[in-house]
A protein has these predicted regions:
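Hydrophobic anchor at the beta1->P-loop junction of P-loop NTPases
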Residues: 6
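A glycine- and Lys/Arg-enriched "phosphate-lid" helix/loop adjacent to the NTP-binding pocket
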Residues: 88-147
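Conserved substrate/cofactor phosphate-moiety recognition/catalytic segment
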Residues: 16-66
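The conserved Walker
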Residues: 10
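NTP-dependent small-molecule kinase module
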Residues: 131-180
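Conserved glycine(s) of the Walker
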Residues: 13
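Pre-Walker A (Motif I) flank of P-loop NTPase domains
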Residues: 1-3
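Glycine-rich phosphate-binding loop used to anchor ATP phosphates in small-molecule kinases
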Residues: 48-107
């Protein structure tokens, strides 16, 4: 069974789509809570390593059949860690690319499907400590596109899903999941 990782920039509707489907169970690492508790720093390399460590553990558990019993959806994953590593100046672009290549070479992305959500909710919101970065969504989106292309070049499946923030988008999302 595949591991489905739902990725995309802030305000693309990822979490809404994931929470409103009942096809597969969902795992969402409580990054904001963990970050706030330990507070390694927004631009700290430690923040990148914390996220990367979580990703390595998740993918190793999956590869060792601990999680392969059924399809699992992960709300944000290795692409987000790489994008935000560069976006928040925690790591250089070259390191993010190298991290993704290493993940691929280690087989950590075998039988993984990336579902990258595209769309932007234009309403203002107060969600978390990262709200101030919403003005840079274009930059974030560019990095998601760049890293998704790299994963495709490495032979991994990336499905781009347009979210129009309507009931039809949710229906199509559920149908997409059922067809994976």
């Amino acid at each position: 069974m595949p591991l489905i990782i739902v990725e995309g920039s802030r305000k693309s509707g990822k979490t809404y789509l994931v929470q409103n489907q009942d096809v597969y169970p969902v795992f969402k690492f409580p990054f904001n809570e963990v970050f706030s508790k330990w507070n390694p720093g927004r631009e700290s390399k430690d923040t990148h390593w914390m996220g990367l460590g979580k990703e390595i553990m998740l993918h190793e558990l999956y590869n060792q059949s601990q999680l392969k019993e059924e399809t699992l959806i992960v709300d944000r994953g290795i692409l987000t860690n790489s994008v935000w590593g560069v976006f928040q100046k925690r790591i250089p672009l070259e390191q993010a690319i190298d991290d993704l290549i290493k993940f691929s070479e280690m087989g950590l992305l075998d039988n993984v499907i990336f579902l990258r959500i595209e769309g932007t909710w234009n309403e203002s919101r107060e969600k978390d400590i990262w709200d101030g970065d919403d003005v840079r969504i274009g930059e974030e989106r560019h990095l998601f596109t760049q890293f998704s292309s790299l994963l495709q070049d490495l032979g991994h499946k990336v499905v781009v899903y347009p979210n129009h923030f309507d009931g039809e988008s949710l229906k199509r999302f559920i149908l997409t999941l059922k067809n994976i």
